[in-house]
Amino acid sequence: MDIKEIALGQIRDSIATKQKCIDSILEDIIKAGEIVSKILQAGNTIFLCGNGGSSCDASHIAAELVVRYKSGNERKALPALSLSADSAVLTACSNDYGYEEIFSRQIEAFGRKGDLLIGLSTSGNSKNVLLALEKAKTRGVKTISLLGGDGGKMKNLSDLDVIVPSNVTARIQESHILIGHIICSIVEYNLFKME
């Protein structure tokens, strides 16, 4: 196998995973976009959390909502926050309460009835994301999980699960960011009639 074959294999695997998303979870993706739109139309806040690459995806999606998704779409800022963005809170909470509490503690502080938490986990087994989703339920915060594989321990914990049909972390992450982009596109269309 040469380098070109490796590259082509990655691209083909990515395309195949996205085709599986069209075939099996398109309606869930659209539903997620509609939920996020309604939360924002009501003036509530979107929180996002995840670990590692999923943390980066959470921050990326939050930035698209706060700033804008499509270049040239001038619109007002939307309230969205990645819970992995504040290093002081993350390190203080990790030190004082444990890493598992870094997101749930912030939901306890900031989450209000009518807000939405989007938890991202390629395995569905991230304890700190799971605890944040559980805390959200106690505060009247709606929940969406972006997962992979069989959904892990987080499956059926949220109001809506969007489970990428793959067990390959890279393919799940690629699909999660695509799902995030689709959600942002739906939001900009629903709230501002921007395509």
Curated annotation (Swiss-Prot):
Residues that coordinate or bind substrate: 51-53, 64, 95-96, 121-123, 126, 173
Cofactor: Zn(2+)
E.C. designation(s): 5.3.1.28
Main subcellular localisation: cytoplasm
Gene Ontology cellular component list: cytoplasm; DnaA-DiaA complex
InterPro entries associated with the record: GmhA/DiaA, Phosphoheptose_Isoase, SIS_dom, SIS_dom_sf, SIS_GmhA/DiaA_subfam
Cross-referenced Gene3D superfamilies: Glucose-6-phosphate isomerase like protein, domain 1 (3.40.50.10490)
Location in the cell: Cytoplasm
UniProt-recorded Gene Ontology molecular function terms: carbohydrate derivative binding; D-sedoheptulose 7-phosphate isomerase activity; zinc ion binding
The entry's keywords: Carbohydrate metabolism, Cytoplasm, Isomerase, Metal-binding, Zinc
Biological or metabolic pathway of the protein: Carbohydrate biosynthesis; D-glycero-D-manno-heptose 7-phosphate biosynthesis; D-glycero-alpha-D-manno-heptose 7-phosphate and D-glycero-beta-D-manno-heptose 7-phosphate from sedoheptulose 7-phosphate: step 1/1
One Pfam family, short name: SIS_2
Signal peptide: none
Catalytically driven reaction(s): 2 D-sedoheptulose 7-phosphate = D-glycero-alpha-D-manno-heptose 7-phosphate + D-glycero-beta-D-manno-heptose 7-phosphate
BP term (GO), one: D-glycero-D-manno-heptose 7-phosphate biosynthetic process
Disulfide feature: none
Domain SIS per the UniProt entry, residue ranges: 35-195
Note, other: The reaction produces a racemic mixture of D-glycero-alpha-D-manno-heptose 7-phosphate and D-glycero-beta-D-manno-heptose 7-phosphate.
Protein's job: Catalyzes the isomerization of sedoheptulose 7-phosphate in D-glycero-D-manno-heptose 7-phosphate.
HAMAP family to which the protein is assigned, alphabetical: GmhA
Listed name of the protein: Phosphoheptose isomerase
Source species: Leptospira interrogans serogroup Icterohaemorrhagiae serovar Lai (strain 56601)
